[in-house]
């Protein structure tokens, strides 16, 4: 049991603040174990509540949880955080060393074996562009089309960590998680890439 979702916590707080059921729509899903920074969401509140009232009120109700609202502003009634998002970004932090980190335990993926970040980055560049990413979506993906455009994908060595950053307007369910797994296989020397096609990349 991973406990209530961030959306559920926000909706519970919003209902207390507005004294009525208040749905909260985020710009995208946040899977269990994922830390969301800069997540955008929208909700409808009574007109007498200012953006500052909403931010302060929600934070007061969320202070016992690991969720905080860092800013709020009024938007058009037609605004939708999910469908109006112009770009989404993922950052995977991999701690590539034998020993785990006590302080970063819940913020990084600990990988005991050394990884070749240069090879991983070169492989990542073949996935930039518009492709059929069927090979990288999870079985439960409900997207109508597997076609997505990867705007940016990089792999950088950052001290004892390897950072994988991906940016696109939208992603398939578990697309970046599965791409990260494949790039790690490249970094270990277990997987070679010879084609810019995502389908060939995993075969």
Question: Residue ranges of each PLM-predicted region?
Answer:
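Single conserved hydrophobic/aromatic residue that forms the stacking wall/gate
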Residues: 193-203
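Structured-RNA-binding interfaces characteristic of tRNA pseudouridine synthases
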Residues: 1-195
């Amino acid at each position: 049991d991973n406990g209530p979702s961030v959306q559920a916590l926000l909706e519970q707080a919003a209902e207390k603040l507005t004294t009525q059921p208040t749905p909260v729509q985020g710009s995208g899903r946040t899977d269990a174990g994922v830390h969301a920074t800069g997540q955008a969401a929208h909700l409808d509140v009574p007109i007498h509540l200012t953006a500052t009232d909403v931010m302060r009120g929600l934070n007061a109700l969320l202070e016992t949880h690991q969720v905080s609202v860092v800013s709020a502003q009024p938007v058009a009634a037609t605004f939708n955080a999910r469908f109006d998002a112009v770009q989404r970004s993922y950052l995977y932090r991999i701690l590539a060393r034998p020993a785990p980190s006590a302080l970063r335990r819940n913020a990084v993926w600990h990988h005991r074996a050394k990884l070749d970040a240069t090879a991983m980055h070169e492989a990542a560049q073949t996935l930039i562009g518009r492709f059929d990413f069927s090979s990288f979506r999870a079985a439960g993906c409900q997207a109508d089309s597997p076609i997505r455009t990867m705007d940016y994908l990089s792999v950088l060595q950052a001290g004892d960590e390897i950072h994988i950053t991906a940016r696109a307007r939208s992603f398939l369910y578990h697309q970046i998680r599965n791409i990260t797994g494949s790039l790690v296989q490249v970094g270990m020397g277990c997987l070679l890439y010879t084609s810019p096609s995502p389908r060939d990349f995993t075969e």
